């Protein structure tokens, strides 16, 4: 592969897309693969109170700064590194003191619930995968993750799931399944399946 290519891994919250992206990162190695979480591009909300931030709909397309991400992807495709923002999920805003350096390696993976929603992002993808996982399993994974890793209460996770997460999944995320080059189940996969997917990605981007 002579220059950077962008691929996407999309799917519902807690579908396994982040795990898949990092499995591909591990297989390809850091010299060839880097991962950009779409979550890093949540719009900064430092100008409103924490209470107001907690009430925002984080599963709607407007929650993400897709323009900034597209600009960064264009820079990578031009051979330039970028400083991706880092998002603080406990405070619902960007960490203004830190960034994540992303270099124009062979394959840059954009992973997130709406990675396939934005036309301006789809325009630069060389390959795309949608991770399809049962809703009940996704909820159980989300509950465990948000309580243990993001400082959330079980009640708040339940409330957010019913109010925005699941409705927005049905409206904006699930329809993008049809836009993916490939659909994988998120219940489980083995090393062989990851290796075969990596081969297909390499073939598509060469």
Predicted regions, residues:
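Post-Walker A helix-loop "phosphate-sensing" segment adjacent to the P-loop in P-loop NTPases
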Residues: 26-34
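ATP-dependent NMP and nucleoside kinases share a basic, alpha-helical "lid"
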Residues: 95-149
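Conserved nucleotide-sensing/catalytic segment adjacent to the nucleotide-binding pocket
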Residues: 34, 43, 47-90
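NTP-dependent small-molecule kinase module
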Residues: 103-104, 144-147, 166-206
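Hydrophobic positions on the alpha1 helix immediately C-terminal to the Walker A/P-loop
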Residues: 20
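Conserved lysine of the Walker
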Residues: 17
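P-loop (Walker A) phosphate-binding loop of NTP-binding proteins
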Residues: 12
């Amino acid at each position: 592969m002579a220059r950077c290519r962008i691929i996407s891994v999309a799917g519902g919250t807690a579908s396994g897309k982040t795990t898949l992206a990092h499995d591909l990162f591990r297989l390809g190695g850091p010299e060839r693969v880097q991962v950009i979480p779409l979550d890093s591009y949540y719009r900064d909300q430092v100008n409103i109170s924490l209470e107001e931030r907690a009430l925002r709909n984080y599963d709607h397309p407007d929650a993400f700064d897709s323009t900034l991400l597209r600009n960064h992807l264009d820079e990578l495709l031009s051979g330039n590194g970028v400083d991706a923002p880092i998002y603080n999920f406990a405070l619902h805003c960007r960490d203004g003191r830190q960034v994540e350096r992303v270099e124009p390696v062979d394959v840059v993976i954009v992973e997130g619930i709406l990675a396939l929603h934005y036309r301006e992002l789809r325009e630069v993808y060389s390959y795309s995968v949608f991770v399809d996982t049962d809703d009940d399993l996704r909820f159980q994974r989300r509950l465990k993750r948000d309580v243990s890793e993001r400082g959330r209460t079980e009640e708040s996770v339940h409330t957010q799931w019913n109010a925005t997460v699941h409705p927005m999944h049905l409206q904006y995320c699930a329809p993008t399944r049809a836009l993916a080059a490939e659909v994988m189940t998120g219940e489980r996969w083995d090393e062989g399946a990851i290796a075969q997917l990596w081969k297909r990605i390499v073939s598509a981007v060469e």
